[in-house]
Swiss-Prot record:
It holds the Pfam family COX2_TM. Cu cation A1 binds at residues 161, 196, 200, 207. Component of the cytochrome c oxidase (complex IV, CIV), a multisubunit enzyme composed of 14 subunits. The complex is composed of a catalytic core of 3 subunits MT-CO1, MT-CO2 and MT-CO3, encoded in the mitochondrial DNA, and 11 supernumerary subunits COX4I, COX5A, COX5B, COX6A, COX6B, COX6C, COX7A, COX7B, COX7C, COX8 and NDUFA4, which are encoded in the nuclear genome. The keyword Mitochondrion applies. Residues 1-14, 88-228 are mitochondrial intermembrane. This is Cytochrome c oxidase subunit 2. Belongs to the cytochrome c oxidase subunit 2 family. One of its GO terms (cellular component) is mitochondrial inner membrane. Its cofactor is Cu cation. Component of the cytochrome c oxidase, the last enzyme in the mitochondrial electron transport chain which drives oxidative phosphorylation. The respiratory chain contains 3 multisubunit complexes succinate dehydrogenase (complex II, CII), ubiquinol-cytochrome c oxidoreductase (cytochrome b-c1 complex, complex III, CIII) and cytochrome c oxidase (complex IV, CIV), that cooperate to transfer electrons derived from NADH and succinate to molecular oxygen, creating an electrochemical gradient over the inner membrane that drives transmembrane transport and the ATP synthase. Binds a dinuclear copper A center per subunit. It is found in: Mitochondrion inner membrane. It comes from Sus scrofa (Pig). It is an enzyme of class 7 (translocase).
Amino acid sequence: MAYPFQLGFQDATSPIMEELLHFHDHTLMIVFLISSLVLYIISLMLTTKLTHTSTMDAQEVETIWTILPAIILILIALPSLRILYMMDEINNPALTVKTMGHQWYWSYEYTDYEDLTFDSYMIPTSDLKPGEMRLLEVDNRVVLPMEMTIRMLVSSEDVLHSWAVPSLGLKTDAIPGRLNQTTLMSTRPGLYYGQCSEICGSNHSFMPIVLELVPLKYFEKWSTSMLT
């Protein structure tokens, strides 16, 4: 869960989000080193009075500043491609959930069950109970089993939306006429909040997402109660 004046990412609760945090730190270190080197060179150029007459035609320097950026780009691209593959590859999911974006709410369908569907609307501020989050609570939470691979199918009924849950490293565009997929797995139970991340109209800010990750036995009890 995010908190006021937060500078970093939310705590990772999925393997993909952990990989994204490592990649962020890896890339930030490279950017910091490059920025430090550039600032050092600029300070030298501003403070020294000496000039190197052969710098205008130095093959060695040109070779270095051609090869070195290529190596840096490779060091950034390789872990990025690995994470992209992890996010797209879904092997034998234990559960498939289809979510549809509407103006301005979400609907969910558990495709492994015969008739388990519901809509999820934001709870108005006037109806909130003590301790609940303003603009983030919904009337129907998405209950899912933890420590299991879940496939999310994301689409839209009307305009562009985006289904995003930051602490799980999820952000998938909901496009009318197209079915996108992403994988989800939580390493611990809890409530995970998200919102629509694509401006979709006047009530775009009122499309929260709440995932409730629970142990498998509690998920089975919940699904049974929803079907009866």
